[in-house]
Every structure is written in C-alpha cells, then in structure tokens.
Amino acid sequence: MIATTNRHASQREIVPATKSLARVSSIGARSFLLEAPGDFDLVAQRRIWALSQTVKDWADLAENIPGMTNLLVIFKETPEDPDAVVSRLLEAWENARSIDLKGKTIEIPVHYGGEYATDLPALCDLSGLSDREVVRIHHEATYRVFALGSAPGFGYLHGLDPRIYMP
C-alpha cells in the first residue's frame, strides 16, 4: 500500500461565497477557481473578463480560462502557499473593473420547425405561449457569448428571455 497526502484536500472550499465576496476553490494542486458572487449576468462577466486580463501577466501563471462568471487559473508549479494565492486572487478581483470585450456579430440560422424543433411543443406547454410567440421572443433577442465551451465553436450564450427558459 502506498500512503499519500494531499495538503490541498482540506482547502477544497477555501473562501465561501457571500453577497459581495468572490468564492475561491482549489481545483487540484496547481489550479484555483474564482467564482463571481451574485447573479449570472453581464456585470459579473465583465469583471471576470477584466480579472482575466489582469492575471494573464502573472509570471507564475501557466494559463487562465474565463468561464461563465468564473475564472480558472492554472499555475506553472504547485504554489507553496495556497492561502497567499487565494488572497492574491481576491485582491485582484476587488480591483477588477468592468471591461467590455470587442467582438463581432455572428448570425446563427435557427430552424424552428420539423425534425429540428422537437422541444418546441414542450416549451409551449411549459411557458403557456404559442409556437409563434416563442419563435418571435427567441428571434428578437441578441445573445452574447460569455465563454467558450470545450467543443470547437461552442459558445455559452447569455441573453435568453426568461419567458422561454426551459430547465
């Protein structure tokens, strides 16, 4: 039997989330996840983008990956003092100001009928809206990519009208 120890195991949830404080979790030995407090919205995401710009210049950082109102930071080496990393991330979060990343508009064709719209009747039943109303509401919105997914070309979008949200 091989005995091992994990000095990060007790720090799985290093800083709990509060109304105004970000949450930092240890994700393995070299990675930390900062989650923005509050709602999933553009305000929080813009601060995540600003934080990503700030930490990208840290000499000891291998990579930073912005997610949906969170930021994963991966260090080159296992940090000697995880608490210092947490403090550093929280300080950077507190100093992060909202930025708006420039992008481009991409029009995505949507097929609302036939074999591609198998969930449309269920959405109409859940929302109480007609199929025409669902299509109109969905089509009128402008969606913003908050983060890139793990599959090529997959973006996590924000901006769905709550009337057509389906769990």
Per-segment meaning from a language model:
Residues M1-P167:
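Conserved "landmark" site that anchors the functional core of diverse proteins
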